[in-house]
Amino acid sequence: MKKLSLLAMLTVLIGSALFVTSCGGKIQADTVWQLTKSAGVSVEAQKQYVCFGADGKVIVATKASGTLVKVSLLSGDYTAKGGKIKAPMIAGGVEADYKISGETMKITYNKAELYELKKVSSPTAKEMKAL
C-alpha cells in the first residue's frame, strides 16, 4: 500500500513539473516581440517586430520613420510546438529550436543563434494585424 501511495505521489509530482515546464516555454498567442539580435549581432535600433497570432499567422514589420510597415516576404503561416518553430522569417524554411526565458525568446538552428527577441507591449498585436 505504501509503495502504491508513493508511486501515485511521484507520478503527480513529475506530471506537475512537466506541465509547468511545457507551459513556460510556449509562445503565447497574439504577442509581439522585438528583434534584438540576428546571428548574435545587435539589431535593436532597426526596430523590427514579430507578432505570433493565435490564428497560426506570423506578421513581421519594421518601424520606418515612425510608421509600421509589414514585411510580407517574412510574414505568413507558422507552427510552434514542443520547442520547435517553423516560420517564413527562418531562412530556408527549416524547423528551428526556440526557448523562452521570461520576456526573452531565442531561436536557434544546429545550436547557432539565429534570433533573439524580447516581448514588447508596443506595437500591439491589434496594430500588427491591421497592417
What are these regions (language model features)?
Residues 18-22:
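C-terminal motif of bacterial Sec signal peptides marking the signal peptidase cleavage site
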Residues 38-44, 59-115:
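Contiguous, well-ordered beta-strand patches that form the walls/edges
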Residues 54-58:
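Structural signal for glycine-centered tight turns and loop->strand junctions in beta-sheet-rich domains
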Residues 111-131:
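C-terminal partner/receptor-binding element of secreted or periplasmic proteins
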Residues 1-9:
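Bacterial N-terminal signal peptides that target proteins for export
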Residues 9-17:
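Bacterial N-terminal signal peptides
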Residues 29-31, 76:
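A glycine-anchored, Pro-Gly-centered beta-turn/N-cap motif
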Residues 24-26:
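Bacterial signal peptide processing site
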